[in-house]
Amino acid sequence: MMLTSNSATEWWKMFQESIAKELSNTPSQRLWEAWGSRGRRTIFYTEDLLPPVARELGLEWETELLAVDYAMSLPISRVPLVFVEAENDIGNAYNEVRKLCCLSAPVRVLLTVGEWDATEGVWSHGGLRLTLLKTWQAIVEAHVKARPSASVLGVLVGEWCDALPARSDHRLRFYSYLIDANAALSTDQTEVLFERIIPSAGLI
């Protein structure tokens, strides 16, 4: 389902009609209680009013979906041009990708860490690159199909290897990828953005 300006207006009409219906079906006592305090009103929205609206629209109900870790904005106007989500648990980074896809800044960035290198012998499981990169790309593709956007998703993956094959030094890498506005993985860039071999000797 692709959203256009017309279909977005239709969604708004359905949303407001459902809100009106739920409010009409709410007893006066419950409305009075909800307006007793800010906290009660928030509970009313969260528990009574909005979940039934989501169900009627055939949508999944979620709370506190968007809270962005970092933003880089234009001076004065403070319009964000870059949003960054940092996730230390790479297995849960799909949530950050979903969140970033909901934002309209030109550049959205996932910054995460994990056992990434697919080179044989580096990681016993063979590295997470192929699996997770495809997963994140599929999330972007689903969003593009529903709501085309000119924004891109940058992916930065930090990787620390404690012991490389045949040596005891440490290696820190950052891998970089770009998933473009059509959800295609760009090949016009260097995969390894940064690499440093760090000798074990001298580290405290």
Task: Show where each model-derived region lies.
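Hydrophobic/aromatic beta-strand patches that form the interior of the parallel beta-sheet core
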Residues: 84, 109, 154-156
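Short connector loops at helix/strand junctions that flank enzyme active sites
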Residues: 65-67, 79-81, 105
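Catalytic cores of nucleic-acid endonucleases
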Residues: 87-143
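Non-catalytic C-terminal interaction segments of nucleic acid-processing enzymes
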Residues: 138-204
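Conserved catalytic cores of phosphodiester-cleaving nucleases, focusing on short active-site segments
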Residues: 70-72, 78-88, 100
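Acidic-basic catalytic patches of nuclease active cores, encompassing PD-(D/E)XK
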Residues: 1-64
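Long amphipathic alpha-helical segments with strong coiled-coil/leucine-zipper propensity
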Residues: 59, 66-74
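Charged, terminal alpha-helix-loop-beta segments
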Residues: 52-64, 107-110, 138, 144
